[in-house]
Amino acid sequence: MPKLGMREIRRAQLIDATLHTIDQTGLAGATLASVAQRASISTGIVSHYFGDKDGLLEATMRHVLRDLWQATSRRRRAAKADPRSKLRAVVAANFDAEQTSGPVMKTWLAFWSESMHKPPLRRLQYVNTRRLNSNLCADFSKAMPRAAARRAASGLAALIDGLWLRGALSGEPFDTKAALRVANDYIDLVLASRE
């Protein structure tokens, strides 16, 4: 009989092993066997919990996205009520230390690539994109008409993705301060044009 809570413990252990395996070997090298070896468990247990490599990547990305959504919610709740503060909170969550760690960044890159070919991953990416745009648009809408807010949100979302992608591909540790500065300057410019 399995121990109570063992499922959650094993899944967390395997997701962590997946993040670190992708970090070290890339997605191609992140086989069920290599993840199992890193987690010091049998390949059969990985298959039991996730089915196959696609299921493992999907579960790993659900975990990463949940962390991002929780960080976004936490930062938005802590921010002042004005649009600038709320927008900066969303930006800060996207450049949070957890989201810009090597294992998570490499997993994001693998996920984006795979999401173009795998419907379950495409759906996750769609939900993530909609959530980001919804948050940004809602906050910009407090300072400008809805159509302008949509354009501003689209621009900031593209800037977040672009800064994140450049940082991920730079081969250097992610420069969070520089990314925050550029994104926050954009927010200030857009909002200043409406004041």
Swiss-Prot record:
Entry keyword Repressor: yes
Residue span, HTH tetR-type domain: 8-68
Signal peptide as annotated in the record: none
Domain of life: Bacteria
Keywords carried by this UniProt record: DNA-binding, Repressor, Transcription, Transcription regulation
DNA-binding residues: 31-50
Pathway noted in the entry: Amine and polyamine biosynthesis; betaine biosynthesis via choline pathway [regulation]
GO molecular function: DNA-binding transcription factor activity; transcription cis-regulatory region binding
GO BP field: glycine betaine biosynthetic process from choline; negative regulation of DNA-templated transcription
Transmembrane segments: none
Function according to Swiss-Prot or TrEMBL: Repressor involved in the biosynthesis of the osmoprotectant glycine betaine. It represses transcription of the choline transporter BetT and the genes of BetAB involved in the synthesis of glycine betaine.
Name of this chain's protein: HTH-type transcriptional regulator BetI
Gene source species: Paraburkholderia phytofirmans (strain DSM 17436 / LMG 22146 / PsJN)
Phylogenetic placement of the source organism: Bacteria, Pseudomonadati, Pseudomonadota, Betaproteobacteria, Burkholderiales
Underlying gene: betI
